[in-house]
A protein has these predicted regions:
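Hydrophobic, aromatic-rich transmembrane alpha-helices
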Residues: 94-102, 277-324
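Short acidic/glycine- and proline-prone juxtamembrane loop motifs at membrane-interface regions
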Residues: 124-138
Length: 530
């Protein structure tokens, strides 16, 4: 029987990513804002355009394109369904990692499989299935780093020093590589390093483990981001462009942090209890509504554990550790540190999805400790089941933007009436850079209005490049569909006036563009030098 259980478990772990790919085909094609803005464009900008165009994807033009390289080539040459299946397969690799994380805390395979399955089908994770968003694509690296860190915390940590140091370094390396692919994942990597400081070893050994993990994280970050940071620094003046530009002072971005602070909590109390607030008001942390009760449930259990620890300490007049094992301390401290960094810098829910995947494992650990050492297992089991059932019944998946399937992921038909080579000044508030790769390679695109303001240096460079083109157009998504964009035509000084042009609306051309079956009419209007 045990042999059959082993084989069935192994089959489930191996087959799950393949099955997850088929599940993605029933969710429809991804057509989210980020895809239309930069996921498809950025690899083209680096590999084909050689960074000649200026900010077509707004500030996201400068993101590390390494994670999107496979998507770009696949979307250009494969069917949309094949692309989505491949994306979901990679996302499904988190399942076996979650299983092995759960196995650190339970000997029951069925419980570990259940925790992994619930985690990968949680609201945030499942909303991104088959989507090119990087939160779930980098999750296998972040979760893999956590798993290696947990292995380093096993009892042999008190003996085999070289093995443990190697595991700690590997944990940092894998997690750091994931953070380099998507910088918003760095709270997980920092927390992985810090968590080694709380295990029950002499301080010097804990420090050595944290140092080894930190060195591994730096190497991993350099492997995935180093090339791009160097490219940004040498060509554009900052390795983190456009962020932290008050430090790096690149002339190609405003001298500020250039971060999105709209979703940050106000004050310490809001930050500490943010899971409860975003559960009641999902738009605090996401542009769409969603519901996932596991995060506030986990915080509630953690608060009860703290209250219990304080009460026991006061009664016995001696400190009693909340968590008995190094693995428990490691994963709980990692969770808390990740959350605190995230809520202070980002507070965007989808950046926390790898932690959401872990919540069912964490709930099992924390609920067990809540009732320890009395061991009333029926009560603990009932509480855990109640949380899981409540989460499943109330779960609401975030609609990131889906469409029916088309043969090709993206279709753009460039009208023959546009004279090439031409320059296009991109305006408006909508994402449209995905259309740029379908234009002739000798055309020039420059964003003069968007979510980042062109600096004087950027304006000067655009003006210089425009001199080489006799035919110049304004480029935007149908302005009549967006009143704020349509108002540009009636402004006394519209954005293109800065570059010495007036618009001729009589010669406007609609460019048929489509993500899946969703059409997006991109318009060009000729500009005349004033």
């Amino acid at each position: 029987m045990n042999r059959w259980a082993v084989w069935l478990t192994a089959a489930a772990l191996v087959l799950f990513p393949f099955v997850y790919g088929f599940v993605a085909l029933h969710r429809g094609e991804d057509a989210d804002w980020d895809l239309m803005n930069y996921h498809f464009f950025d690899p083209f900008w680096v590999l084909v355009n050689h960074q000649h165009d200026i900010m077509p994807a707004q500030l996201q033009t400068y993101y590390n394109p390494l994670l999107d390289f496979p998507f770009y080539f696949a979307a250009r040459h494969l069917s949309a369904r094949t692309v989505a299946y491949g994306i979901a397969f990679v996302q499904g690799l988190s399942f076996p990692i979650l299983y092995f994380i759960a196995r650190v805390f339970t000997q029951r395979r069925v419980l570990a499989l259940g925790a992994a399955g619930l985690g990968i089908f949680a609201a945030g994770a499942f909303s991104e299935i088959g989507s090119v968003m990087g939160d779930t694509l980098t999750a296998p690296f972040l979760l893999g780093g956590i798993l290696l860190g947990l292995y380093a915390c096993r009892p042999p940590a008190h003996g085999a020093r070289r093995r443990v140091l190697t595991l700690a370094a590997a944990a940092g390396l894998v997690s750091g590589f994931g953070s380099g692919l998507k910088l918003s994942a760095f709270p997980f990597t920092v927390a992985t390093v810090i968590a080694f400081l709380v295990i029950s070893l002499p301080f010097t050994r804990r420090l050595a483990l944290a140092f080894a993990s930190g060195c591994g994280a730096v190497v991993g970050l350099l492997l995935s981001y180093g090339w791009w940071g160097y490219e940004l620094a040498t060509r554009w003046g900052s390795p983190l462009l456009p962020y932290l530009n008050q430090v790096f002072a690149s002339p190609y971005a405003p001298l500020s942090s250039n971060t999105d602070a709209r979703r940050l909590p106000h004050g310490v109390l809001q930050a500490l209890f943010y899971p409860f607030l975003w559960t009641a008001q999902p738009l605090r942390t996401s542009p769409q509504t969603f519901r996932e009760l596991t995060m506030p449930a986990l915080e509630a259990v953690l608060l009860l554990l703290v209250i219990k620890a304080v009460a026991v300490t006061a009664h016995r007049r001696a400190w009693r550790p909340i968590f008995a094992s190094d693995a428990e301390r490691f994963i709980v401290v990692l969770t808390v540190v990740t959350y605190l960094i995230w809520v202070d810098i980002f507070a965007i829910y989808r950046y926390l999805i790898p932690l959401e995947m872990l919540t069912f494992v964490l709930l099992g650990v924390c609920v067990r400790r809540l009732f320890s050492p009395l061991k009333p297992w029926p009560i603990a089991a009932c509480l855990l089941v109640a949380i899981i059932v409540a989460s499943l019944v109330t779960e609401r998946i975030d609609n990131i933007g889906r469409t029916a399937w088309a043969d090709r992921y993206i279709t753009v038909l460039v009208p023959a009436s546009i004279v090439h080579p031409a320059a296009f000044l991109m305006v408006g508030s909508q994402p449209d850079a995905y259309a740029v790769p379908y234009f002739p390679s000798d055309d020039f695109f420059a964003r003069i209005q968007g979510n980042i303001r062109p600096t004087p240096t950027v304006e000067a460079r655009i003006k210089k490049d425009l001199r080489a083109y006799s035919h110049v157009y304004v480029f935007w998504v149908d302005p009549n569909a967006f009143p704020t964009d349509a108002a540009l035509l009636t402004q006394p000084r519209p954005p293109w006036a800065t570059y010495g042009f007036t618009v001729s609306t009589s010669g406007c051309i609609a460019i048929p563009a489509r993500i899946g079956t969703v059409g997006q009419s991109v318009h060009t209007c000729p500009l005349v030098r004033s």
